[in-house]
Structure formats: structure tokens, C-alpha cells
């Protein structure tokens, strides 16, 4: 396996600028069950805001790059000179910065929006980061550079209360007809075509999904519902890819085994942060209960015998706005 790529490890492009956004100050963070969380928006966003979480997000960026055969976006999107690109929930900013590197030195603009400002201090001149709750009115930085050629949204299930409202907002800020919206989501319901699901993993998945349902930010992934919402809230030409994510290297082909190795690594880094706050705050489980569940799930993830044939599904949706839509 290749090393995990981080935004801070990328070479500095000529003309790089200092980011205007600082990392969260100590008073903006609070500690809970051994992890750091951002004070705002405490009652909504349930994932940590520490370095360990940043590393986890970068593992998924690497996984998606492998799935896309070393590309940064799907073939539906065209990013070229003078393109404007928006990344919703940009995390560490790795994807945004990689996009800027790919197009350098052509003029373009890449904007990353997130509730957590954990991106590098030194960034390409074509990159901007803005602190934003993307369900609230968008920031001036986001609005003034619309319409966009590409709006990217990855792994935002569990962070959004109203997908229809967000889809309408995205459609309103996308270039009519030519602009593309891309959404990547993992269905965390484990599957196996020829055997049972490992019990601890099934329990982990069931309980986290129940907690996030109660929290009002479901992580469930319904293909038909997503397609219907996109079509009913401003989009046309909706396309979907369904990709198997083996949770270990049991696939018969080398590409499947490589995806399995990376997803196994990502899953190992995800069971605890994805369950800690939901089970503690929403389901009122004790730290000991959560720790024991995660240790049991982790043992299964690390066991080839338990994971043989087990997988999740990754769904990639691409969509354009209707020809008649105008901002």
C-alpha cells in the first residue's frame, strides 16, 4: 500500500499564499471521551475535530482516488482553465489542494467550505477556504464565485438535516446545463452474499444508524430516494455508480484487493469516531460499553476469517441542473 497523502505534505506551488483561516483555538474545542470536538456546532456535528480525525479523512480521500483510477473527479465533470469549483465539507482541504495542483498554472478557483478550519496555513493561490455551515445561508466567499463548474460533496451523510433543501441550494449555484454536482456516500449497512455478517460489526452498524436517525442526521443510504430527491429539487441527467467496497483483501482481482486493503484501513480508523458521540450523547451509552463494542468490531475487521466476503457499497451520483434553470 502507498503512504497516506496529507495536504501538509504536498509540494508548495509557486505563488502560494497564507490561508486566512486559522485552525480552531483551544477555547473552540472541548474534550469528550478522549477526543477533541469543535464547540460550534456542538449539538449537530458529532465527529471529532482533532488530528486523528484529519488523518482518517485523508485515508478516505486516498481510497476514492484509487477507486477513480488516480483521478480526482468522475468523467462527468470537466475542470479546465477558468473553472470555479466548490467542495462542500472539505475536511482537511486535501481534495481542493490536489485539484489546484492538477490545474496549475492555469487560472482557476477552488473553494473549500467546512465547519472545521483544519486546512494548511500555506495554500495555492487559486484556493480559498471558508468556515461555513452549508445548510445555513452560504458565505459571501461561496456565493460571489458562483455559478460553479463543479460542486463536490463527499461523506456528508450524518452532517445534513435536510438533503432536499441542500440540493436546491447546490442547484441554484451550479452552472446551468454544464455544471456538475458529484456526491460520494458509503452505505454503512454491511453485506455478504454467501454468509452471515460478523456480529459485532452488525451491532455497530445497527446502533450507529439508530443513533443518527434519532439525531436527525441519518447516515442511511437509499439509492432510489437520493435519485428522486435530486430529480425533484433542481437536477437533471442524474447518473449513479455502485461500487463494492470489500472490507478486506478477499476480492479475486488485484484492483478489488487494493480497494479492500484501503477500505479496511479506513474502517479501522472509523468505527470509534463514527460511534463515540452518537452512542454517548444520543443513545446514552457508557464509555465502557462503546469501548467494548468498538474493540469487538475492530477484532472482526482485522480478521480475514470474519471479513471474507463482507462488503459495503459506495454510491457516486453525478447530476446537472435542468436547462431551464437560471439563477
Curated annotation (Swiss-Prot):
Observed phenotype of the null mutant: Impairs the ability to produce TeA under the DMSO-added, TeA-inducing culture conditions.
Reactions accelerated catalytically: L-methionyl-[protein] + S-adenosyl-L-methionine = S-methyl-L-methionyl-[protein] + S-adenosyl-L-homocysteine
GO MF term list: methyltransferase activity
A Pfam cross-reference name: Methyltransf_23
Keyword Plastid appears in the UniProt entry: no
SUPFAM superfamilies: S-adenosyl-L-methionine-dependent methyltransferases
InterPro entries for this protein: SAM-dependent_MTases_sf
Identification of the protein by name: Secondary metabolism regulator LAE1
Amino acid at each position: 500500500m502507498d503512504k497516506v497523502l496529507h495536504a501538509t505534505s504536498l509540494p508548495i506551488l509557486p505563488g502560494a499564499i497564507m490561508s486566512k483561516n486559522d485552525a480552531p483555538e483551544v477555547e473552540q474545542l472541548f474534550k469528550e471521551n478522549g477526543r477533541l470536538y469543535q464547540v460550534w456546532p456542538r449539538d449537530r456535528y458529532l465527529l471529532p475535530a482533532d488530528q486523528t480525525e484529519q488523518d482518517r479523512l485523508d485515508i478516505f480521500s486516498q481510497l476514492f482516488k484509487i477507486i477513480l483510477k488516480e483521478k480526482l473527479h468522475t468523467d462527468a465533470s470537466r475542470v479546465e482553465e477558468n473553472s470555479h469549483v466548490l467542495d462542500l465539507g472539505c475536511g482537511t482541504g486535501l481534495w481542493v489542494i490536489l485539484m489546484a495542483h492538477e490545474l496549475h498554472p492555469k487560472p482557476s478557483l477552488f473553494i473549500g467550505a467546512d465547519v472545521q478550519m483544519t486546512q494548511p496555513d500555506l495554500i495555492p493561490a487559486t484556493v480559498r477556504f471558508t468556515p461555513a455551515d452549508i445548510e445555513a445561508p452560504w458565505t459571501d466567499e461561496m456565493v460571489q464565485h458562483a455559478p460553479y463548474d463543479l460542486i463536490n460533496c463527499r461523506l456528508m451523510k450524518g452532517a445534513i438535516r435536510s438533503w432536499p433543501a441542500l440540493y436546491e441550494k447546490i442547484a441554484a449555484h451550479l452552472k446551468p446545463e454544464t455544471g456538475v454536482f458529484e456526491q460520494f456516500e458509503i452505505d454503512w449497512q454491511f453485506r455478504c452474499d454467501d454468509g452471515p455478517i460478523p456480529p459485532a460489526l452488525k451491532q455497530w452498524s445497527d446502533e450507529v444508524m439508530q443513533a443518527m436517525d434519532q439525531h436527525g442526521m441519518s447516515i442511511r443510504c437509499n439509492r432510489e430516494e437520493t435519485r428522486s430527491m435530486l430529480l425533484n429539487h433542481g437536477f437533471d441527467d442524474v447518473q449513479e455508480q455502485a461500487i463494492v467496497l470489500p472490507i478486506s483483501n478477499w476480492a479475486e482481482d488485484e484492483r478489488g484487493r487494493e480497494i479492500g486493503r484501503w477500505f479496511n484501513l479506513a474502517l479501522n480508523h472509523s468505527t470509534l469516531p463514527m460511534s463515540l458521540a452518537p452512542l454517548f450523547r444520543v443513545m446514552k451509552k457508557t464509555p465502557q460499553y462503546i469501548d467494548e463494542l468498538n474493540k469487538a468490531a475492530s477484532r472482526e475487521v482485522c480478521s480475514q476469517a470474519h471479513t471474507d466476503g463482507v462488503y459495503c457499497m459506495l454510491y457516486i451520483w453525478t447530476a446537472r441542473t435542468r436547462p431551464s434553470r437560471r439563477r
